[in-house]
């Protein structure tokens, strides 16, 4: 007998629906155990997936997927969904080079109805699908599953506002709330109420009553207010009712005896409906229940012993460099304010939040607000530091231009996860920031080559009386220990790190080590350019005058990046050398180990050498 007898019978939701409902709790136990075993071998998101086991089973058991559309917000909680939809064996290659994604992908499965990874998009997408079904005369359902964190973002409420006026669509929004728990009395009561409010008898009575009371609008309004008042006394759903949704819950998201009948009832109803379920991150794995943050995103580990603290000195990361610098500068200047859009741990702000709680602001998943909030602080003489991932800064581009750069406000950006981030893949690579930042007036853009340079650039940005950004990669670099002393770098000035002949490598940021290795084989000059904006035009002109080939290197898409700006400088020269621009290709790059990804795009040292030799042969030039 296989170790997971029920789970091994399921290769699609069609197999799942053949099970007797009484078998579902046992299936949930098997699925949870399989997740723990599988993710401990591959790494990935664990706590959130353990919290959605029963919900994943119930949705595919009740709804006619993939005909009915399920859109998972963010999508890092979809491993159970993937396993139930034919990808159980593929989990052994989860988030690995050439393997399946850790997020929903339309190209991966017809059950992945919408690609997600950035938050708060599910309701908008599901609404679009629901409207499409209505316009085609189709009866299929659209379901958006959104977490309480993602629910806090403005885009989610924009979608609710739009959907609430549409009475002729089949849309169900499920709030997966894992920030609270249900006490037994409330849980028992709300389970009954969710069944009652979602049941056919109750809703038929509601419609009949509305028809009768419709002849007397004041009585109809009074009846609705009484209903809302009674529900509001025992449920937190008043807000969603105000948006035009019928609210049900909260119910226990781990209780299949509550989920199954409630979803069965909701499937029969038309219009916009909102189901509130309470789940627990790490459910069923005591170590993850005790510390869901530690087990949120994991590397490989022994699931019987749990995650162990690494022995010896850990590799220094750029994120740690930023976190230490922020605490150091905040101790010197009480006007420094730290801001993050829901990325305290990932951005290295845990220590700052503990030591300077009155100057720490986690604004939630609200990148647009984070930037304009920072702009307001800057207007009043404070020094806001926005710690944000490169991929999430994209969501606040208008605020960056209109609210900060246009007014030349001294807002500082610590941009983490620039370049290729690894296992999170295309949705999280910081592949575009040099392109979309380099065109903004007033903005200074820096890219450190090592950890110490990162610290000095952060200080340079802090000292600059205008908007400034420091972009650095995920993980560690050349392991150059940061100096305690801080000194501002001359803005717009690079440096020569190696002198050579005929070929000059102009490096912007994290590829310096690879460039130095390549230069040894090519006897090339290596320039650490440091600043993407403003460029060191003088240094470029000097290198152009003394070399036959200039090669730009950046961990950013080639189109519109630093290499494009170097090309613009060379255009003004009457006698200019050849130019080769190396960077990320014009495609979305999949997931995998960072070193594997760099090799795949030719930005490791051998790839750099090969690209240059294909373009330039000293004997023929």
UniProtKB/Swiss-Prot annotation:
Give binding positions for Mg(2+): 148, 178
- The record lists thiamine diphosphate as bound by 76, 117-119, 149-150, 178, 285, 367
Give the record's keywords alphabetically: Isoprene biosynthesis, Magnesium, Metal-binding, Thiamine biosynthesis, Thiamine pyrophosphate, Transferase
Q: How does it assemble?
A: Homodimer.
Q: Which family does it belong to?
A: Belongs to the transketolase family. DXPS subfamily.
Record text on cofactor binding: Binds 1 Mg(2+) ion per subunit.
Which reaction is catalysed here? D-glyceraldehyde 3-phosphate + pyruvate + H(+) = 1-deoxy-D-xylulose 5-phosphate + CO2
Q: Which HAMAP family match?
A: DXP_synth
* Name of the gene this protein is made from: dxs
Identification of the protein by name: 1-deoxy-D-xylulose-5-phosphate synthase
Against SUPFAM superfamilies, the record matches this protein to:
Thiamin diphosphate-binding fold (THDP-binding), TK C-terminal domain-like
Q: What class does this enzyme belong to in the EC scheme?
A: transferase
| Pathway(s) per entry | Metabolic intermediate biosynthesis; 1-deoxy-D-xylulose 5-phosphate biosynthesis; 1-deoxy-D-xylulose 5-phosphate from D-glyceraldehyde 3-phosphate and pyruvate: step 1/1
Q: Which GO terms describe its biological process?
A: 1-deoxy-D-xylulose 5-phosphate biosynthetic process; isopentenyl diphosphate biosynthetic process, methylerythritol 4-phosphate pathway; terpenoid biosynthetic process; thiamine biosynthetic process
The Gene Ontology CC terms held by the record are:
cytosol
Q: Which GO MF terms are attached to this record?
A: 1-deoxy-D-xylulose-5-phosphate synthase activity; magnesium ion binding; thiamine pyrophosphate binding
**Entry superkingdom:** Bacteria
Function per UniProt: Catalyzes the acyloin condensation reaction between C atoms 2 and 3 of pyruvate and glyceraldehyde 3-phosphate to yield 1-deoxy-D-xylulose-5-phosphate (DXP).
Entry's Pfam families?
DXP_synthase_N, Transket_pyr, Transketolase_C
Return the EC number: 2.2.1.7
Question: What cofactor does this protein call for?
Answer: Mg(2+); thiamine diphosphate
């Amino acid at each position: 007998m296989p170790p997971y007898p029920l789970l091994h019978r399921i290769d699609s939701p069609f197999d799942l629906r053949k099970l007797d409902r009484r078998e579902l709790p046992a299936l949930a136990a098997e699925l949870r155990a399989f997740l723990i075993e599988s993710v401990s071998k591959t790494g990935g998101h664990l706590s959130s997936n353990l919290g959605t086991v029963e919900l994943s089973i119930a949705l595919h058991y009740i709804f006619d997927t993939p005909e009915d559309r399920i859109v998972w917000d963010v999508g890092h909680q979809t491993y159970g969904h993937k396993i139930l939809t034919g990808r159980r064996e593929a989990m052994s290659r989860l988030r690995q080079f050439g393997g399946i994604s850790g997020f929903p992908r339309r190209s991966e499965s017809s059950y992945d109805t919408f690609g997600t990874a950035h938050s708060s998009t599910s309701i908008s997408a599901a609404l679009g699908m629901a409207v499409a079904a209505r316009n085609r005369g189709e009866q299929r359902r659209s379901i958006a599953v959104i977490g309480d964190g993602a629910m806090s973002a403005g885009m989610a409420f924009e979608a609710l506002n739009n959907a609430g006026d549409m009475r002729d669509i089949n849309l169900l929004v499920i709030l997966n709330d894992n920030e609270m728990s249900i006490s037994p009395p409330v849980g028992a009561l709300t389970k009954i109420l969710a069944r009652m409010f979602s049941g056919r008898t109750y809703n038929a009575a509601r419609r009949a009553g509305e028809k009768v009371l419709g002849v007397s609008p004041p009585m109809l309004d009074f009846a609705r207010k009484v209903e809302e008042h009674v529900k509001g006394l025992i449920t937190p759903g008043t807000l969603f009712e105000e948006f035009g949704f019928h609210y049900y819950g909260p119910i226990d998201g781990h209780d299949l005896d509550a989920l199954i009948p409630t979803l069965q009832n909701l499937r029969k109803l038309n219009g916009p409906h909102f189901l509130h379920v309470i789940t627990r991150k790490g459910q069923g794995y005591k170590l993850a229940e005790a510390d869901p943050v530690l087990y949120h995103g994991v590397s490989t580990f022994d699931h019987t012993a749990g995650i162990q603290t690494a022995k010896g000195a850990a590799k220094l990361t750029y994120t740690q460099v930023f976190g230490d610098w922020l605490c150091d500068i905040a101790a010197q200047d009480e006007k420094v304010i730290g801001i993050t859009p829901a990325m305290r741990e990932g951005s290295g702000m845990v220590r700052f939040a503990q030591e300077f709680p009155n100057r720490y602001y986690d604004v939630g998943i609200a990148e647009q607000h984070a930037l304009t909030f920072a702009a307001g602080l800057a207007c009043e003489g404070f020094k806001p530091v926005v710690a944000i991932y490169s991929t999430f800064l994209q969501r606040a581009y208008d605020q960056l231009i209109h609210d900060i750069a246009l007014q030349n406000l001294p807002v500082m950006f610590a941009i983490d996860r620039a370049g290729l981030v690894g296992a999170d893949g295309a949705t999280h690579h910081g592949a575009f920031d040099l392109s979309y930042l380099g065109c903004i007036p007033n903005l200074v853009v820096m890219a450190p080559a090592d950890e110490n340079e990162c610290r000095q650039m952060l200080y340079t940005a802090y000292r600059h009386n205008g908007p400034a950004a420091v972009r650095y990669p995920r993980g560690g670099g050349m392991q150059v220990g940061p100096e305690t002393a801080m000194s501002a770098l001359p803005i717009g000035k690079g440096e020569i790190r190696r002198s050579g002949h005929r070929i000059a490598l102009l490096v912007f940021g994290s590829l310096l080590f690879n460039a130095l290795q390549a230069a040894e084989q090519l006897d090339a000059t290596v320039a650490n350019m440091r600043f993407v904006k403003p460029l060191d035009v003088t240094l470029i002109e000097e290198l152009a005058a003394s070399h036959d080939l200039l090669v730009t290197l950046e961990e950013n898409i080639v189109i519109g990046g630093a290499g494009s700006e170097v090309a613009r400088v060379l255009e003004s020269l009457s006698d200019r050398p050849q130019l080769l621009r190396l960077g990320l290709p014009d495609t979305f790059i999949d997931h995998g180990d960072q070193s594997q990804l760099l090799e795949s795009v030719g930005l490791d040292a051998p790839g750099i050498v090969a690209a240059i030799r294909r373009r330039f042969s000293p004997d023929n030039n």
